[in-house]
A protein has these predicted regions:
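DPxDG-like acidic metal-binding loop motif
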Residues: 1-13
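Short, structured interface segments
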Residues: 16-18
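An extended, acidic
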Residues: 20-138
Length: 138
């Protein structure tokens, strides 16, 4: 069978099934990906320190696929360092419409026209802020 994902003003759909994200994921049950490239030394160290707080951390090496996984509920989060707009605009849009959340380490949402780095994208604002708390050592 052929599968297709699309959005309209009411949400994100896989074929004709509306995708609804679970916003109750606990850190210890979370599955996600972490970019381990391009961090400054201090952030890289912190990223490695928090990695084992999650159930599973893995990556395809393709953020586009990982955004789809978040929208599909197969992955809960992604922690990203370098942000080229062409890699992130479609995925951030899909995750937002599906009910997920994105924010930089300063809690501001991603804006493609700002030259920025360090983004967390997940199935919920709650999970994003829990990840930020880990990064801040709280």
């Amino acid at each position: 069978t052929e599968e297709f994902m699309y959005t309209d003003s009411n949400g994100v759909y896989l074929n004709d099934n509306k995708l609804i994200l679970n916003d109750n994921t606990k850190i210890e049950n979370a599955v996600g990906s972490i970019s381990f490239k391009y961090w400054d030394e201090e952030k890289r160290k912190k990223i490695f320190e928090i990695k084992n707080n999650f159930h599973n951390v893995n990556s395809y090496g393709s953020i586009g696929c990982e955004y789809f996984d978040i929208a599909l509920g197969q992955r809960n989060f992604a922690i990203l360092s370098r942000l080229y707009p062409w890699d992130h605009i479609p995925g951030v849009f899909i995750v937002r419409i599906a009910g997920g959340h994105d924010c930089h380490f300063d809690k501001l949402e991603y804006k493609f026209y700002n030259n920025s780095n360090n983004l967390i994208v997940s199935n919920s604002k709650k999970l994003n802020y829990e990840i930020l708390n880990l990064l801040e050592g709280e």
